[in-house]
């Protein structure tokens, strides 16, 4: 283990001086004592729930702040990155080196003269591509989050651990000069990919630490020819690997936690010449409306060492997972070893045989499942479509479409077509089959039942879907099965959920126009005419 003197010298290099005490890679037991200390107040203090998990609040920041994300634009990144001033769907807002230095001084000043938690971890399960990362924070539960979410080095590795990337979390400080610097607010998440550092200020949301590193890996891995993906992954007893892509709320985590399949990871993965590997060492699952009978793997993972965010804790220490008074984005982080059926000892597996693109369509247009051609797979990957309701929960009143390239535009460092090309290459080599699965709503305003979605996933993974007759869905030209075991055949064709089929036709045309408008921005060689033709046609 590194000595305190060495770490203090390294902190000085980051601009952090005169630390009162350093707590280096503490155990979970020590972190629990620290984060539940009665002398702590407000957002620093955690509560022990009756499951043994710690519950914390993140204040007004119950989700990511994409408008407060910045990356230093320098000679190395200027021509490589997908910048927001070139495409408004990118969250990569450029800042100058001068602004960066100012922000760095703010955060380093905040962390100076403090008791600090130093956590050294790996991002990436593959030794030849993993990143050595150091997190520095003054908040115990933030250190707990990091320990849950990333891969822990062993004692031997820690003796000579040399971080390649530094994360300074100064959640307690803000930027008083944000207006003069043309920034969105006093809060910021800033990355310097050349220097190898991330700064966090103003926001307490734990996910900023996790997703900041994902952006970093989305920069480094593709430049090495490795596909980086916002997806969950699991593997069957026959070593068949499935990837689940999808935006938040589409079921990515829920559907990949399967008692019959070993979990590789729930959110971030790479795909190299050897196969699939996890970038993380933990899971970050939504807990709203969590029920043990529907999501038993996640429910049983909430125990000692798990960290709950923004849940409602009752006086007796129990948690009300149905209370969304704080946020619909209540979450829990826990280490992968909380999942009994997981890939061991490292989160790696062979090449993917199946890819499932999850969408939660609130328009009532898309089918519960469709088989995709190679071109359609690239089209829907680049589109990254989902939708949510701005009206009531029941009934499709005012769908809000979301197009997030590669099902993770907020985390991409390079242009989306770079990731699409790498994924297409890996799929072609491995002979991967792709499917579109809609976990959203049908024409009568009912959400597709989880039991039906799970039966659809089973039909895909056991290859039953490959032997069933199909029909073509007009406008979108999607191949949909006519029958699947365990699934009500009446829901497979979305048109049957409408009393008047012309109503589906009208909604389908409206949604198709949105797809076409969104995809028109992709004009590079990869997205040639055949990819445009793979989408809906009017």
Swiss-Prot record:
One of its GO terms (molecular function) is metal ion binding. The keyword Lyase applies. It catalyses: oxaloacetate + ATP = phosphoenolpyruvate + ADP + CO2. GO terms for cellular component: cytosol. Binds 1 Mn(2+) ion per subunit. It comes from the Bacteria. Keywords: ATP-binding, Cytoplasm, Decarboxylase, Gluconeogenesis, Lyase, Manganese, Metal-binding, Nucleotide-binding. Gene3D superfamilies: 3.90.228.20, Phosphoenolpyruvate Carboxykinase, domain 1, Phosphoenolpyruvate Carboxykinase, domain 2. Substrate binds at residues 64, 205, 211, 331. Mn(2+) binds at residues 211, 230, 267. InterPro entries: PEP_carboxykinase_ATP, PEP_carboxykinase_C, PEP_carboxykinase_N, PEPCK_ATP_CS. It is found in: Cytoplasm. One of its GO terms (biological process) is gluconeogenesis. Its cofactor is Mn(2+). Its EC number is 4.1.1.49. Signal peptide: none annotated. ATP binds at residues 211, 230, 246-254, 295, 331, 447-448, 453. Pathway: Carbohydrate biosynthesis; gluconeogenesis. Belongs to the phosphoenolpyruvate carboxykinase (ATP) family. Monomer. Involved in the gluconeogenesis. Catalyzes the conversion of oxaloacetate (OAA) to phosphoenolpyruvate (PEP) through direct phosphoryl transfer between the nucleoside triphosphate and OAA. This is Phosphoenolpyruvate carboxykinase (ATP).
């Amino acid at each position: 283990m590194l000595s305190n003197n060495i770490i203090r010298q390294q902190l000085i290099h980051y601009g952090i001086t005169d630390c009162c005490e350093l707590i280096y890679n503490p155990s979970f037991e020590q972190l629990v004592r620290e984060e539940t200390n009665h002398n702590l107040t407000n957002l620093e203090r955690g509560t022990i729930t009756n499951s043994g998990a710690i519950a914390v609040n993140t204040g007004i920041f119950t989700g990511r702040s994409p408008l407060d994300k910045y990356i230093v634009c320098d000679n190395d990144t200027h021509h490589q990155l997908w910048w927001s001033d070139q495409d408004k769907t990118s969250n990569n807002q450029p800042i100058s080196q001068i602004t960066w230095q100012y922000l760095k001084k703010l955060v380093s000043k905040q962390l100076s003269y403090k008791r600090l938690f130093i956590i050294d971890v790996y991002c990436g399960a593959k030794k030849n591509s993993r990143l050595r990362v150091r997190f520095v924070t003054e908040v115990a539960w933030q250190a707990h989050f990091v320990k849950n979410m990333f891969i822990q080095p062993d004692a031997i590795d820690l003796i000579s651990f040399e971080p390649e990337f530094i994360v300074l979390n100064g959640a307690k400080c803000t930027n008083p000069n944000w207006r003069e610097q043309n920034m969105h607010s006093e809060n910021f998440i800033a990355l310097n990919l050349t220097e190898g550092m991330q700064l966090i200020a103003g926001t307490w949301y734990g996910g900023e630490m996790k997703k900041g590193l994902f952006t970093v890996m989305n920069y480094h891995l593709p430049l090495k020819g490795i596909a980086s993906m916002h997806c969950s992954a699991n593997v069957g007893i026959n070593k068949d690997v499935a990837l689940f892509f999808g935006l938040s709320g589409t079921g990515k985590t829920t559907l990949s936690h399967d008692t019959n399949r070993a979990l590789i990871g729930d959110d971030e993965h790479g795909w190299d010449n050897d196969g699939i590997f996890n970038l993380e060492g933990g899971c970050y699952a939504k807990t709203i409306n969590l029920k043990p009978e529907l999501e038993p793997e996640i429910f049983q993972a909430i125990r000692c060492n798990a960290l709950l965010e923004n849940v409602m804790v009752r006086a007796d220490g129990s948690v009300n997972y149905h209370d969304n008074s704080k946020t619909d984005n209540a979450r829990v982080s826990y280490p992968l070893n909380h999942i009994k059926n997981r890939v061991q000892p490292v989160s790696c597996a062979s090449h993917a045989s199946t890819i499932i693109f999850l969408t939660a369509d609130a328009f009532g247009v898309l089918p519960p499942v469709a088989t995709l051609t190679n071109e359609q797979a690239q089209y829907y990957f680049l589109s990254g479509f989902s939708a949510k309701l701005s009206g009531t929960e029941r009934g499709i009143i005012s769908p809000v479409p979301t197009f997030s390239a590669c099902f993770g535009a907020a985390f991409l460092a390079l242009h989306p077509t770079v990731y699409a090309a790498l994924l297409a290459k890996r799929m072609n080599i491995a002979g991967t089959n792709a499917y579109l699965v809609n976990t959203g709503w049908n024409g009568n305003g009912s959400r597709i039942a989880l039991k039906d979605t799970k039966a659809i996933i089973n039909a895909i993974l056991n290859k039953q879907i490959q032997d069933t007759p199909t029909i073509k869905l007009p406008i979108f030209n999607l191949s949909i099965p006519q029958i699947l075991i365990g699934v009500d055949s009446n829901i497979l064709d979305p048109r049957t959920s409408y009393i008047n089929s012309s109503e589906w036709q009208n909604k389908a045309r409206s949604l198709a126009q949105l797809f076409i408008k969104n995809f028109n921005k992709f004009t590079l060689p990869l997205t040639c005419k055949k990819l445009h033709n793979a989408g809906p046609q009017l």
